[in-house]
C-alpha cells in the first residue's frame, strides 16, 4: 500500500472543487480528486503550523499548553516509528520553519526529505539593496520579494 498525505497551511477547503467549490478553476485538484480518498469528517487540535505538525507526529494534543517548538527527547514520532519498522516516508516541504531555531528535529524523523526554498520569509537568496515593491502587492516580507525574482513562472 502507498499513502500520500498532502497538507496546506493556508488553503481553505471551501475553495477547492473536491469540497464543492464550483467557481474556482483548479484542474490539478480536480485530477487529484479522481485518485484519492477525501476525508469530510476530520478535526484538528491545532491550527498553527508547528503545533499541528507536532500533534501529527506524536498523536497528542499540545496547543495552548505547550509552546511552538521542536520534538522533545520524550516525544514518540509516527514517522520515526515507520522508519524503524522499514516503512519508507518522505517529506517534501516549503515550510521553512522546520529549519529554524526551535523548529528543528521534525524532518530527521522521515526516511528522507527535501526543502523547497523561497517561500514566505525564507532568506533563500541574498540581495544587499532593498527590493522594489510594486504598489499592487502591498506589504510583503523582504525575503519573499527578493526570492520571487529567482523563481521561474
Predicted segments, located by residue:
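PAPS-dependent sulfotransferase catalytic core
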Residues: 29, 41-42, 60
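Short helix-loop boundary/capping segments at the starts of domains
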Residues: 13, 38, 62-66
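Short, surface-exposed acidic-centric catalytic microdomains
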Residues: 42-55
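Active-site-proximal N-terminal segment of extracellular/periplasmic enzymes that hydrolyze or transfer
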Residues: 1-37, 46
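Residue-level signal for pocket-adjacent positions within structured domains
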Residues: 11, 34, 38, 51-52, ...
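Catalytic-site neighborhoods of secreted/periplasmic enzymes
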Residues: 55-153
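A short beta-strand-to-alpha-helix junction
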Residues: 22-25, 44, 69-76
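Conserved S-adenosyl-L-methionine
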Residues: 37-44, 88-94
